[in-house]
């Protein structure tokens, strides 16, 4: 549990960010903190304490407490704390540096990419100006050391002078994952060839030529990715190709409205039957959980596109594209289901545990969403919609889907935060830093017997996009970051039994055992002496 005492009062977002910062620190130290209560005291001269900008500081403080190490009190840090220990940007940077100087501090740690940042000043007419400043000028003005730190690892090093968590080995991809994803890619790319053959007699005009060229281009990318061994990327490209080929095939069939409705009915039945099969699967590992998430999401998405088909019957071209997409989404779901029942470290995945994980993740998103909306009130409507879907899943008891959608929504917000105030020519650096963190997380998860298939899949896809589309790569690296360490929300079914013993003070345990042995020995001696006295007494008689 987390207890927070503040003066003055604090807003909810600070309470949430404190809880999340604690979780990140516990994960960073690889310690199960579920048996400990954490008490934090925050005092300030401001009218109210708000925002998540103390997240990095709280994580450093919590880390030092857990590891029982001293840190340099002449150092200060500001920044949000995000999945994987990534330190995110904050507002009011100039004022914070000035405050650190007044307090006599020697070093200030700030988020990466803020060499030039902006201050937001609000006026009565809700107009704002962007006042830029150069941190090099502040360094000279105050003679204070200002250092950019991208991760919690780097911040801890600046506070302690020690490195505690570095990537030990290169990432080893699970052979089960590799074999299964390879088979998934083969299935989807083989379907591309099959669908392509269906349109051999296609009448080509300007419109269909564009569709055909796109389908062929995606299919070619799928084959190239497969030959390079990046099977998730291959499967993704072939899925896109399949949608285009299927759409072209449907166009040339000239289906009547009744025939379209009949196809919709058949597909709905197919979804229902397959969904029942999936519900019977037992979720034991992170791989199972993420497989279940992605399969259910695809089935739900297919169902939604079938709704769109029925709503757009008067627009033949639109409803046929939606029909093609729904069909391919179902096929994709069936392919992903092959990841269910993979081996790995087992966790306690009862409904209550997953519900709590979902609620925690929703709280994390809300905290960040409120913060970002202070600067971009109109630009996150899609994320808000995704979050609303997650809340609906929570209400309906679909906790796995809720966790999945909330994780993706959080990645959306974190992606905006990660480039907020970052110059365009620094985006590649931010992306590489995120990918590096994801890779390290994946290495550590693998060492723990966990292989997050979605985390790795998105990591692979982000790498394939980083040169051609760095902003999309940032988003997918965010998905990878969120979905590569879901285990921090769950307890290992085996670990609980081990921790039960580990939580006992070993010295007290040894003393207890020694006491029991001495007690038994004393009883034996007493009993022996008693018998001896009895024999002497009888001889005297």
What are these regions (language model features)?
Residues 1-223, 252, 268-296, 300-303, ...:
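Peripheral, non-AAA+ core regions of ATP-driven protein-machinery
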Residues 530-541:
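Cytoplasmic C-terminal tails of single-pass
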Residues 250, 258-363, 367-370, 374, ...:
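Long, low-complexity or tandemly repetitive, helically biased scaffold regions used
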Residues 219, 226-227, 233, 306, ...:
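Hydrophobic/aromatic side-chain positions at a characteristic register within alpha-helices
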